[in-house]
């Protein structure tokens, strides 16, 4: 993946805890094109790499806009970019990748965003409007002051945007009404906290929507009980090395400690950067990147979070 040097051109305080960072090329050239739903890897000065969705219209090549929530429970990514970066500072980023594309057969769309989940959804709204595809956007927030990109939403999508504010009965969403029209060319896109997304997905499935019509973007992997973790052994194809992975470490950590180079990014099983081929053994899949069908093949796994059901896992790092 190609990395680029960009400059933080502007910083906007969207809400008390969300800032938008407008990024431009350091050499003045256009930035690589992207599609709605794309994200970029941001390599931070504290050594962490984090993924942030692009929120601006994909027809713009002079800038990228990312929205970053300052999470008090952050592992260091959002805290670093909020506290340690100012306008004019340089950032190293990767080229855009898209794991949350608008389905090619979408003729009508329903967009759901919860909190910071508006970031990829906003870019989708721009794209759908440009393509003249009918859509509605339902944005759920805890309070009015927590609405990110309020000006953009009300200016560009006055007929499509619906704000749903917690504990305000007049803004509550009637899910059954929103989801009552079930048609093969109608697709649903959702991004936000895990519980919110599960609620939307469950509601749609109960209303008769098929899995092929439902699309979601994870920012944080669902919590997994680690108390039952067991140690296992990794054998690296082409070497005589046997790497012991303790119950309290990830496969990636064990491999790096023993000198093996494993690309990592999100460290949560979201981005797919670390996917590694499995030669033999059975992985214990804990990622949200691969599909159930891909998991069933057991021919690859994400060492940043997944483990092994078998005692030994033989992998290919070539």
Swiss-Prot record:
Keywords tagged on the record: 2Fe-2S, Aromatic hydrocarbons catabolism, Electron transport, Flavoprotein, FMN, Iron, Iron-sulfur, Lignin degradation, Metal-binding, NAD, Oxidoreductase, Transport
Enzyme class: oxidoreductase
E.C. number(s) listed in UniProt: 1.14.13.-
Residue span, FAD-binding FR-type domain: 1-103
PROSITE patterns in alphabetical order: 2FE2S_FER_1, 2FE2S_FER_2, FAD_FR
Cofactor(s) in the UniProt record: FMN
GO molecular function: 2 iron, 2 sulfur cluster binding; metal ion binding; oxidoreductase activity
GO biological process, one term: lignin catabolic process
Record-listed FMN binding positions: 1-97
Pathway: Xenobiotic degradation; vanillyl-alcohol degradation
The protein's name in its UniProt record: Vanillate O-demethylase oxidoreductase
Organism, scientific name: Acinetobacter baylyi (strain ATCC 33305 / BD413 / ADP1)
Gene it is expressed from: vanB
